Amino acid sequence: MAGNSIGQHFRVMTFGESHGIALGCIVDGCPPGLEITEADLQIDLDRRRPGTSLYTTQRREADEVKILSGVFEGKTTGTSIGLLIENTDQRSTDYSDIKDKFRPGHADYTYHQKYGIRDYRGGGRSSARETAMRVAAGAIAKKYLKQEFGVEIRAYLSQMGDVCIDKVDWNEIENNAFFCPDADKVAAFDQLIRDLKKEGDSIGAKIQVVATNLPVGLGEPVFDRLDADIAHALMSINAVKGVEIGDGFDVVQQKGSQHRDPLTPNGFRSNHAGGILGGISTGQDIVASIALKPTSSITVPGDTITRTGEPTQLITKGRHDPCVGIRAVPIAEAMLAIVLMDHLLRHRGQNFAVQTETPKI
């Protein structure tokens, strides 16, 4: 099975399944000398961790990360960093009914057809449980970016169902279980989740992720454009069905005179491009949004087939998120951090001595 790693200079490879013994990852390319502890990684893992509120899955995993290698006396050594999280709250019997059935809207059918075998317990490798290791690796990247370059990466829930935020208060995001920057919308999100639980249904969501204080020049045209790699990373998150950079699909309705971001000696007048032009960072905020589909793990009966092709119905048992978008906020931050870390190291390796007569705005 290929496709388990991302990045070139800063490379992350994950392994493990939803109901396996443990999850793990290897982080290659982290520069030496970065002060890092398990407690540093645990901060973001706790933000993603299941069972922390009434609004997410009640599977209770501590998600306590262990650093196995690559760190000595509290600092990275420049060698491979090994990370491990043990699974402790598996209830595999919840999935015995789907051993020979395919859950509609999930990867059961495609994994079975591709590999001829699948781990049906919680979706196995296709489960969002795998993203715990992305968050752990992303926490390393986030700390390096912030400490060495002042880059900060933050995300928030901007829409759930038909409820959209009206304002962004960065100080409000960590004050509620939804990572919502608009305190006036928290009650509406709360009621929506409660209604969905009664119905046994789920809902989609939109998340915006922003990186600030980024230097100009990151990105490797043409196939490794910064926005292309960001889209690739964000699209790899479970349930993501759409990615926008800057104004995204709204550009369809814009004229060129509206969309272009005029340059002045004091900076850009706007940021419709989301901080990227020609696949290279402008030094403005990197702004991206992702759309996440509603999970198909619901108690509303759905039509499907058995392994032998017989028609049947399925009601999904187990513990699931009524909106997967809530816990995807720290995952989106992690994936953006991994991409930016990789591109920053690539840029530094090739272009560190480049100087121009044009001032950076």
Curated annotation (Swiss-Prot):
SUPFAM superfamilies associated with the record: Chorismate synthase, AroC (SSF103263)
Disulfide bonds: none
Catalytic reaction(s) noted: 5-O-(1-carboxyvinyl)-3-phosphoshikimate = chorismate + phosphate
Pathway the protein contributes to: Metabolic intermediate biosynthesis; chorismate biosynthesis; chorismate from D-erythrose 4-phosphate and phosphoenolpyruvate: step 7/7
GO molecular function: chorismate synthase activity; FMN binding
Cofactor: FMNH2
Binding residue positions for NADP(+): 48
Enzyme Commission number(s) from the entry: 4.2.3.5
Keyword annotations from UniProtKB, A to Z: Amino-acid biosynthesis, Aromatic amino acid biosynthesis, FAD, Flavoprotein, FMN, Lyase, NADP
One biological process term in Gene Ontology: chorismate biosynthetic process
Keyword Lyase: yes
Lineage top rank: taxon: Bacteria
Cellular component terms (Gene Ontology): cytosol
Cofactor notes: Reduced FMN (FMNH(2)).
Residues noted as binding FMN in the record, renumbered to the chain: 125-127, 238-239, 278, 293-297, 319
HAMAP family recorded: Chorismate_synth (MF_00300)
Known role: This reaction introduces a second double bond into the aromatic ring system.
Family: Belongs to the chorismate synthase family.
NCBIfam families: aroC, PRK05382.1
Assembly mode: Homotetramer.
Protein name: Chorismate synthase
Gene: aroC
